[in-house]
Amino acid sequence: MEAMRPLWFQTALLPEGWTAQVRISGAAGRISSIERGVPPGAQDERHAIALPGLPNLHSHAFQRGLAGLTERRAGGPDSFWSWRELMYRFIEHMDADEFEALCAQAYVEMLEAGFTQVGEFHYLHHERGGTPYADPGELAGRVAAAAAHTGIGLTLLPVFYAHGNFGGAAPQPRQRRFLSDPAGFARILEASRRAVRSVPGAGVGIAPHSLRAVTPPELAAVLALGAGGPVHIHIAEQLREVEECLGWSQRRPIEWLLENAAVDERWCLVHATHASTAELQGIAQRAAVVGLCPMTEASLGDGIFPAVAFAEYRGRFGIGSDSNVRVDAAEELRLLEYSQRLAHRARNVLASAAGASTGRSLFEAALAGGAQALRPREEGVGLCSGAALDLVSLQQEDPSLAGASGDALLDAWIFCAGRTAIDCVWRAGVKLVQNGRHRERAAIQARYARVLRHLVSAAA
């Protein structure tokens, strides 16, 4: 890859803080140099405000197709569990081409919203009816194709899913597209690694779905396949899950995991909504990341993660769009803070210190935690030499940013403007979004609309 045209910004958020008149040069998808306090050059591409791109550490991209389709109350109590049945029905008719179309639409929206990398928690492995594809990586390849088409950075997280509940309970018939045994999962994982080779900079981790879906021996077998990469798991999302885990093991889910697995900085514990104080301390001590998905957790009525207590233990977190019911990086951060305000009846509760900007505190924590969760061995986070050239520019003309400078820009973006203030987005040095619109949006959106009309009709 040839050297790109230098980018010049009136102000940029660098690791040391806000810096004026910054030129960023890149080569081979990475930042090759950063010059501070320099006037724009004749060859520079000029912009106003630069931020690092945020990692999206947890996504089920195909669920973008469900957005807006589950907002009708069920006959009985409506919850995560009733929503899950609707999701199972939705995927019964979905083929590989349709799956890829849904993924591509979600990835376009992520890039337009300021996410430049995604951790795809990928558990749909088999054909309709549950028959394995001839290529066990068929649908992993469709995730990779959607990422390559849109340009988003990809960490693919193939999911091991074998059971319907704790203790090796039999799976439900509607879960058959997810299922494998350890040997079958090893084939899926190897095929997934082959599938992402054509995606620049892509990585692969592993994802035991949840303690509900794996037995202890299966968990050990799956972890042995991880090759030192990231490990993601759903955990303690629902109170019912906690109660059933206590009935099975006399331990809470996170408590059991910390006692029975070598949880470390490679791990991302997704949701962890109903963590106890001792569990929060344990996660922080192991330097694992908690993957928070505030919009999905609110949509599903999961509960509110105890973020204030976790922060007191210096816990690490990142954010994810999960079900992709709405894709907006700023709104995930805003809802995280606002949910804590409601719970604690206080303001600016996640600001890192007295006088600190809440927006900056949230942004930098999510940047560091997301980077660790997706690339735990990679050095260089944010806009620094050697890091991936993943960058977002904000529009100086957005009314919500008028008169703002420094950390007030982040506060205005997160708590007011959201994705409407995003101008351009670069991933690995390639400009994918300009004037707030992805360069492939028209074709991808048209394909998505055709697919969704068919799927909605088929699921009716």
Predicted feature locations:
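N-terminal metal-binding scaffold of metallo-dependent hydrolase/deaminase domains
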Residues: 1-40, 49-50
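Divalent metal-coordination and catalytic microenvironments
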Residues: 10, 29, 47, 58, ...
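Histidine-centered catalytic micro-motifs
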Residues: 52-64, 230-239
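Active-site gating loops and adjacent loop-to-helix segments of metal-dependent hydrolytic enzymes
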Residues: 65-101, 127-136, 163-183, 239-264, ...
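Alpha-helical scaffold segments that flank or form the walls of functional sites
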Residues: 68-153, 183-199, 449-460
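Metal-coordinating catalytic core of metallo-dependent amide/deamination hydrolases
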Residues: 126-272
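His/Asp/Glu-enriched, well-ordered alpha-helical/loop segment
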Residues: 259-262, 266, 308-397
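C-terminal cap of metal-dependent C-N hydrolases
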Residues: 388-445
